[in-house]
Amino acid sequence: ERDPNAVLLPRAGIVHRLDKDTSGLMVIARTRQVMDALVQKIAAREVSRLYLALGLRAWAGPKERDVSESIGRDARNRLRMAVVASDNQNGKTAKTSIKLLQNCEQGCLVLCRLHTGRTHQIRVHMAHIGHPLVADSVYGGAQAAGMVRQALHAEQLAFEHPVTGELLHFVASLPQDFKLALTNWELSYNGVSAKQAFSH
């Protein structure tokens, strides 16, 4: 339902963005007070954001890993972001925790937790570790498993309401194309709680 107050807020109350063609949850505030407070919470890393992603190639190595690589504009292609040296003036620190959920010969289903919110962060970090997202042509991911958009879904959001103090937790079920991709690769997903998601 359209909120008439949204026109009075910057960016219509949108607190953070999702990449084009990424499915799932997004936070939209209804008042300026809440919007400003939520923007601060995200900057202070007080908002838990969990994403599901399908990466190309079978996962190898530890089931959990942290990718802490700075991200900046790709010098060769201004439409892309890239991992850059930490002393690069155009780079911003970025950290993603990645956990393997399911694996097969063609690729892997992973859960990603954002510690920072850089443009294309999960897509860049997954490509950097050798698992570009399925159908993410910008970062080298070929179409597979029936997916025609990058296989990235913002599944869970959790934060404390800035006014009431209530702990809020939202979950968005997988869209049909993502479910079909899992079926095509003979993978399954039955959900994971935010508390059980990562060991650290």
Task: Identify the role of each PLM range.
Residues 1-200:
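RNA pseudouridine synthases
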